């Protein structure tokens, strides 16, 4: 199920502890577009849209531009930007006309924030956060962990043992992210997953019920989110014959997962096998292959040399 994320100015303010210097009563405004914009065209009089839906930033470039004009003209130009009703305006330490902006802001319901960051720092911090929050999200049924530092989502039919397997892996020192309902964001060709808010911090163990993970196993065994690099699909015995398993494993198998090509392993769930050990081995194999070493290729090379 695909859903679109929502983001409000208040979330950005709290996340980055921003200093709201005007109109703090209006931080419930919605940010509906990614990116932090520098309104060069608009300041020059080229109004491309009737409204601005993303954050506006004023810094040294805008200050240098305004230096050419009188205070009256600066006020008119800033007024035109405010008329476009952006959800939030941020100005940096090098913006020398903040006084005019703050005076104008009294007539509008647009929150104004002062920061010490440069525009480029904002792009790496605040804009990355906004992009994640506003990206298209899909709700996936699975269990998400970080195994040897690699984000792995366990999938399979209900009752195949995903949650129980997650507990085994955590006891081996790996990290839990979420169980059952996983929100997956697609950002720049990569997938990032986290637990859906209603199930965050909980895990369902068949026969025991719902458990609070951090209280049961420790908050240090959890992280909020991880980049997803591998999908591991657990297969029940009845389905084994329908799957064509790779015998040598010369290449990493991939599948389209949420319109992204991602490493994919089928692992048969058979009584007596340690599935957690096999998953650790799969992750090790993946890391070796992506670093340039291939066990299967070396094995085949040795067989060919011996003429077997």
UniProtKB/Swiss-Prot annotation:
Entry keyword set: ATP-binding, Carbohydrate metabolism, Kinase, Magnesium, Metal-binding, Multifunctional enzyme, Nucleotide-binding, Serine/threonine-protein kinase, Transferase
Residues bound to ATP: 156-163
Cofactor: Mg(2+)
Gene Ontology BP term (one): regulation of carbohydrate metabolic process
Enzyme Commission number(s) from the entry: 2.7.11.-, 2.7.4.-
One function term, GO molecular function aspect: protein serine/threonine/tyrosine kinase activity
Positions of region (Important for the catalytic mechanism of dephosphorylation): 268-273
Keyword ATP-binding: yes
Disulfide bonds: none
Binding-site residues, Mg(2+): 163, 204
Membrane-spanning segments: none
Catalytic activity reported: [HPr protein]-L-serine + ATP = [HPr protein]-O-phospho-L-serine + ADP + H(+); [HPr protein]-O-phospho-L-serine + phosphate + H(+) = [HPr protein]-L-serine + diphosphate
Top-level class of the enzyme under EC nomenclature: transferase
Role according to the record: Catalyzes the ATP- as well as the pyrophosphate-dependent phosphorylation of a specific serine residue in HPr, a phosphocarrier protein of the phosphoenolpyruvate-dependent sugar phosphotransferase system (PTS). HprK/P also catalyzes the pyrophosphate-producing, inorganic phosphate-dependent dephosphorylation (phosphorolysis) of seryl-phosphorylated HPr (P-Ser-HPr).
PANTHER family xrefs: HPR KINASE_PHOSPHORYLASE, PROTEIN YJDM-RELATED
Family from the record: Belongs to the HPrK/P family.
Protein's recorded name: HPr kinase/phosphorylase
Annotated source species: Ureaplasma parvum serovar 3 (strain ATCC 700970)
Lineage: Bacteria, Bacillati, Mycoplasmatota, Mycoplasmoidales, Mycoplasmoidaceae
